[in-house]
Design a protein with these regions (language model features):
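Solvent-exposed loop and beta-edge segments used for protein-protein assembly and interaction
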Residues: 1, 51-53, 95-97
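Primarily extracytoplasmic ectodomains and periplasmic/lumenal surface modules that are beta-strand-rich
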Residues: 14-15, 46-47, 110-113
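Internal, well-folded beta-alpha domain core
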Residues: 64-207
Length: 207
């Protein structure tokens, strides 16, 4: 199996909510590696996010998503009466329109078998064998993936890669602690027009 396993992903509307956002739900301008990893697990029907620890992902943006802001009703139950007006408040949320990107998968350092790369290969070759549920989303359950398909690139082609950079302005999670924030792991990035190189790969790990 080839080490380079590229997929083209298209999502009409998405919000990659910043981890520290509260009343105003700001979005990251690009999908974080942790979010893309979750989508790939869902694609193959895997519910254990630890199953493919060690996989490496490389993400390249093909579009510059348009940002907009919507207002919606956010409910939290402070009063027993569900219709009490104090249980609802306006919630502003940023949305991205037309998110298109490439994700390359490298399972050479995974320990479990079959690897995520092998399972994705099987999902596209024999989709009837995949046991999964729900729509395929990128982030929130509302943000359905419109298309995910095999893609062909060469290692010397230039794309706008999400590149690790200690001075980068994008701080994104590659592993999320859903119980609290203490276990969430971060990496700094910048978008760089380049060919595939070691700095564009992010390994999914818990440390």
């Amino acid at each position: 199996m080839s080490k380079l396993f590229p997929l083209l992903v298209e999502v009409p509307i998405a919000c990659f909510r910043q981890s520290h956002a509260r009343e105003y739900a700001e979005t990251y301008p690009v999908p974080p590696p942790a979010t893309v990893y979750g989508m790939l697990l869902s694609c193959v029907g895997e519910v254990n996010r630890y199953q493919h620890i060690g996989v490496k992902l490389a993400i390249a943006m093909l579009s510059s998503p348009t940002k907009s802001t919507v207002i919606r009703t956010f409910r939290r139950f402070k009063k027993r009466e569900i219709s009490d007006p104090t249980n609802a408040r306006p919630d502003f949320q940023e949305l991205l329109t037309d998110t298109r990107f490439i994700v390359c998968v490298d399972s050479s350092q995974e320990k479990n078998s079959p690897t995520l790369q092998e399972r994705l290969e099987n999902a596209f070759t024999h989709p009837e064998t995949i046991d999964r549920f729900g729509g395929l989303c990128l982030g929130e359950s509302r943000d359905l993936v419109n298309s995910i398909q095999r893609f062909t690139i060469s290692t010397d082609e230039y794309y706008e890669w999400l590149t690790q950079d200690p001075d980068g302005l994008l701080t994104l999670p590659y592993w999320v602690d859903h119980v609290g924030s203490r276990g969430t792991k971060w990496q700094r990035y910048r978008l760089e027009l380049s060919s595939l190189n070691p700095r564009v790969w992010t390994q999914i790990k818990t440390d």
